[in-house]
Curated annotation (Swiss-Prot):
SMART domains: EF-1_beta_acid, EF1_GNE. Residues 114-125 have a biased composition (Basic and acidic residues). Keywords: Elongation factor, Phosphoprotein, Protein biosynthesis. One of its GO terms (biological process) is translational elongation. Residues 110-146 are annotated as: Disordered. It comes from Drosophila melanogaster. PANTHER family: EF-HAND AND COILED-COIL DOMAIN-CONTAINING FAMILY MEMBER, ELONGATION FACTOR 1-DELTA. The keyword Repeat does not apply. InterPro entries: eEF-1beta-like_sf (IPR036219), EF-1_beta_acid_region_euk (IPR018940), EF1B_bsu/dsu (IPR049720), EF1B_bsu/dsu_GNE (IPR014038), Transl_elong_EF1B/ribsomal_bS6 (IPR014717), Transl_elong_EF1B_B/D_CS (IPR001326). EF-1-beta and EF-1-delta stimulate the exchange of GDP bound to EF-1-alpha to GTP. The gene is eEF1delta. This is Probable elongation factor 1-delta. It comes from the Eukaryota. Residues 126-144 have a biased composition (Acidic residues). Belongs to the EF-1-beta/EF-1-delta family.
Length: 256
C-alpha cells in the first residue's frame, strides 16, 4: 500500500481498485469495533462474576442458615452414634452372661460335680500272723452285727412293699344277649346268666331292648378283673345256655 502510494501513475486498473477498497474499508472496521465494545464489556463482566462464584465455592463460603442446619444434623448423628454404641455394649454384656450361664448348666448336666468314688482299701495280709488271730472275737461280733442290720433292713423293705396298694386292672363290659324268638322268657334267661360266677366277675344293671317284630334282647353290664376273668371265657359260658341264647355281642368295652 505504501509503495503504491508513492507511484504517480497506476497502469493496472485492478490494483487501483483494490487499493481504493482497502482505503475505504479501514475506517469502517474501526467503527464496527466501537459498535461491539459494549458486548465485549458484558462478556468480561460475566466472566468475572463466574470466576468470583468459583472462588467462593472453592473456599466453602456458606451462609449462616445453612451452617446452623448442618450443625444440627451433625449433632443429631453424633447422638444416634452414641446411643448405638451403648446398645451394642449392653448386648455384648448380656451375651457374655448368657454364655457363662449355659456353660455352668452344661457342667452340671455332664456330671462334673459328681462325688469321687472312694474305694475301700483292703488290708494287706501278713504272712507272719496267719496262725495268730488277735482280733478274732471282735471280727465275729462285727459280722454278726452287720448280718443283724441287713436282716432288719430286708424285713422293713418287705413290710413296706406288702403295704403298697397294688392297682388292679378292671374293665366295664356291656353284653347284648339275643334270644331265639319272642317266646323266650328273658327274665329266666337273665337269671341263668347271673348264675355264672367267677372270682373277679361282678354283674351289674340290665334292661330289655326291642330289636324287631316284637323280639327283645337282653343288655346286661358287668365289671371284670382283667387278670382273673377272660372275655372269651365269659361269652362262651353264656352261649352254653343254648335253650335261651342265640348269640352274644360286646356292645361296649371300657377300661376302669
Amino acid at each position: 500500500m505504501k509503495v503504491e502510494a508513492l507511484d504517480k501513475f497506476w497502469a493496472d486498473k485492478s490494483r487501483y481498485d483494490l487499493a481504493e477498497k482497502r482505503f475505504y474499508e479501514g475506517p469502517q472496521k474501526v467503527t464496527d469495533r466501537s459498535h461491539y465494545s459494549p458486548l465485549v464489556s458484558e462478556i468480561a463482566k460475566a466472566r468475572e462474576h463466574i470466576q468470583n462464584s468459583l472462588e467462593k465455592i472453592d473456599g466453602v463460603t456458606l451462609d449462616d442458615g445453612l451452617n446452623s442446619e448442618l450443625a444440627k444434623r451433625l449433632a443429631q448423628l453424633e447422638g444416634e452414634h452414641k446411643e448405638l454404641k451403648t446398645q451394642v455394649s449392653l448386648l455384648n454384656e448380656l451375651l457374655t452372661a448368657t454364655v457363662k450361664r449355659l456353660e455352668t448348666q452344661l457342667k452340671l448336666t455332664n456330671g462334673v460335680s459328681k462325688e469321687p468314688e472312694v474305694e475301700a482299701k483292703k488290708p494287706e495280709a501278713n504272712d507272719d500272723d496267719d496262725d495268730v488271730d488277735l482280733f478274732g472275737s471282735d471280727s465275729e461280733e462285727e459280722d454278726g452285727e452287720a448280718a443283724r442290720i441287713r436282716e432288719e433292713r430286708l424285713a422293713a423293705y418287705a413290710a413296706k412293699k406288702a403295704k403298697k396298694v397294688q392297682i388292679i386292672a378292671k374293665s366295664n363290659i356291656i353284653l347284648d344277649v339275643k334270644p331265639w324268638d319272642d317266646e323266650t322268657d328273658l327274665k329266666v334267661m337273665e337269671t341263668e346268666i347271673r348264675k355264672i360266677t367267677q372270682d373277679g366277675l361282678l354283674w351289674g344293671a340290665s334292661k330289655f331292648v326291642p330289636v324287631a317284630f316284637g323280639i327283645q334282647k337282653l343288655s346286661i353290664s358287668c365289671v371284670v378283673e382283667d387278670d382273673k376273668v377272660s372275655i372269651d371265657w365269659l361269652t362262651e359260658e353264656i352261649e352254653k345256655l343254648e335253650d335261651f341264647v342265640q348269640s352274644v355281642d360286646i356292645a361296649a368295652f371300657n377300661k376302669i
